[in-house]
Amino acid sequence: MMFTDAPLHHVGVVQPDEEQALAVMETLGLREAYRGYVPQFHALCIFTHAAQGSPVEFVIPDDGPLMKFNKGAGGLHHLAFEVPDLRALSADFERQGLRMLEPEPVNGAGPFLCNFLTPAATRGIIIEYVQPLPNG
């Protein structure tokens, strides 16, 4: 699976707290589409509406390594691409000697499974892959 085959699903931005995330949303005129909590990543995730493009996901950690992202200040965190079969993609990467952060895909903040390619494979760029769930 190449990037040319996977459309951009969303852009993830870490914010230190919900108040700051909502302030950025207000400044940019973004409206909340939905929110969810991802226990594996200790984070509340707020997705925005996307008129023509991809939504922004505001990631608000309450524990774990994301709290230290960019020295606690937050910022642009990841690009997420949509794939039809996350497990097949993970197996493909494994055959290439690459690995995902989680041993198995996890439930995302929305109706999708997700996993991240280790940043070492992309020279520090954090890439997430998401697989929409049926009826999602």
Language model: regions and residue ranges:
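A cross-kingdom feature marking solvent-exposed beta-strand/loop segments within repeated
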Residues: 8-9, 28, 32-42, 63-77, ...
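Residues in flexible loops and secondary-structure boundaries
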Residues: 16, 21, 38-40, 66, ...
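Amphipathic alpha-helical segments
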Residues: 17-32, 89-97
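Vicinal oxygen chelate
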Residues: 1-4, 7-16, 44-51, 56-57, 68-136
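N-terminal functional modules and adjacent low-complexity/disordered segments of proteins
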Residues: 3, 23-25, 71, 81, ...
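Aromatic-residue detector
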Residues: 3, 18-21, 30-33, 54-57, ...
